[in-house]
């Protein structure tokens, strides 16, 4: 175990979605890092910037409780503490409610509710013992409003939001902050393919659904997440914020 005066942050999937951008933001703000399955070249980039980095592989699937446990254990073994932790997980199931099956429901609950449950359970324990810490659960803006074509997904995301709020209420007296941010309409390959927005004409129609008239970038989203996990804002907990250009 190495002793450090720097804050230690965990990014559960540093190879997907906002993970790489979060890692870069945290490194720029003076953190040492624990990264799950980082993107190629990311570790060398962050170490060159001055961060110590612990890598954990094979932990992308947060539906497995051992994934979150391995990440948190790596932080405690390498650095002796864990100051902040962020994770994104999810399983999209689309279609009308009347055509859904119980298997659809179980699938979306596993990806959207059980996964953050396991992550919260693993991360909150050492933070309670430390008497401080920050956890950010990254979900979906569909948790904040009915979502035609994805009712089970929206409901499961709302469940994760309420889980976050309840955990936050339970551990606030221990100095631990727990918040959630939900995204939609992000400029990301998976979203572009799923929405058909790889076609410029379709993209224009998708962007027209966003009050701000465009898609969000990973870099600006990571910057928005900063105060929830970088130690600069210690008086906010139990909150859900939609990050979707005004859609929610």
PLM ranges: what are they?
Residues 2-34:
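Canonical Rossmann dinucleotide-binding motif of NAD(H)/NADP(H)-dependent dehydrogenases/reductases
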Residues 96-97, 101-109, 202, 206:
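Substrate-binding pocket helix/loop in short-chain dehydrogenase/reductase
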Residues 172, 177, 236-238:
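Short, small/polar-rich loop/turn modules that mediate ligand/substrate recognition or access, typified
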Residues 125, 169-170, 234:
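Alpha-helical segment proximal to the catalytic Tyr-Lys
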Residues 226, 233, 237-248:
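Short C-terminal tail/terminal secondary-structure segment
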Residues 120, 156, 164:
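Active-site helix of classical SDR
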Residues 140:
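Residue(s) in the substrate-gating loop at a strand-loop-helix junction
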